[in-house]
Each structure stands twice: as C-alpha cells, then as structure tokens.
Amino acid sequence: DSGNPEKKNPYEKCLRCLGELVGSYDFEHRIAMLGYGGVIPSTGETSHCFPISLTNNPYCNGIEEAIKQYKNSLPKIVLDGPTYFFPIFKENLSMIKYDAKCPTSIYHLLVIITDGTIHDLDEMKRQLIKNQDSPISVCIIGVGDENFSKMYQLDCRTKRLEDKNANKSDRDICQFVRYKDFRDNPDKIAEHLLTIIPS
C-alpha cells in the first residue's frame, strides 16, 4: 500500500539504499526531491515535476529528511499518469546551470524511481544525447511488475543511445535497473549507481 506512510514501499526502500551513496559523494548531504505524475493539492492539477515537500524548496538535508518529506507528502498527492521523465530531467539541467556558478565542480546524479512505463521515450532519448556533455548521469529504477521494455531503450550499458534522427550518445549517460533484481540485496543498488558516475 504505497499510500500507507507507516509501511515501507519499494520507493522508500530505494531511497534508503541511496543514503550511503549520498553520504560518500555529497559533503553537504543536499538532495533535491522531486515528484512527478501527481495532482498537487494547491492547484488541483496534474504536475510532472514538483518538489516533494509541496513547497518552493526541493532540497532536503540528508536521506532521512528526504524520506520524511516523501512519507508526509504521499497521502496528500493523488497519483496520476501518464509517466513523463523529461520535465524532471529538464529541472535537473536548470539546477546544473545554477551550480555552474559555484567555484567548485558539482556532478549530478538523477535517480528516477518509477512503477510506470515511459510515455516520452523519444524526447528523453533526444534530450539525453543533446545534453550528454552536461555533468549528469541518470539511473532509472523500475519497481513493481510493469512492462519496462521501453526503459531498456534508454540503457547505455550494452549499446549507444540513439534517437529518431540517428544521433548517438558518446558515453554511458543513462542506465535502467529493476528493483526486483536487487530485492534480496538492496544495498547492491547503491553499488550499481557508483558504476555510472565518471571517476
């Protein structure tokens, strides 16, 4: 029951697995928590990119605060489709432009946890290839029993990403994994994510 804040669902389990990863790479422990595919209480409209806190501030201080915000907000949001990834990716690109003003280099890891199939696959391919020189890697974690066949088209591990115009990626910018493949050893999810962060 994903609406029960007392019960750990796969989303929360994935977030907890990411806690160690965040601690290893982000000395500020700053996490931007964004939701998508939900009816926002303040507007009554479906949004495909919004702060989980339901405020104007998407940032959390550490994984525990991120999970707390998620559990507090989940009962207030009516989940809605279809599943679009590009708005979340676009928002991360905006964050990259802002962080580019900082004196130290910052690398972004966008983790998208989803239980639905993607409806903007072609646009995501195009945008990932277009922005492959940006300091960002994307990992999509599929939870549940949905048919995730489209998601594997975004996975760059075995072949280069290619869009409708035959443009191809030059690096491994995006990977897809199924949560159930790590269900017996969820800590391996964080280890897997480390493999897509450039050294």
Regions found by a protein language model. Give the residues of each.
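Acidic, low-complexity intrinsically disordered regions
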Residues: 1-199
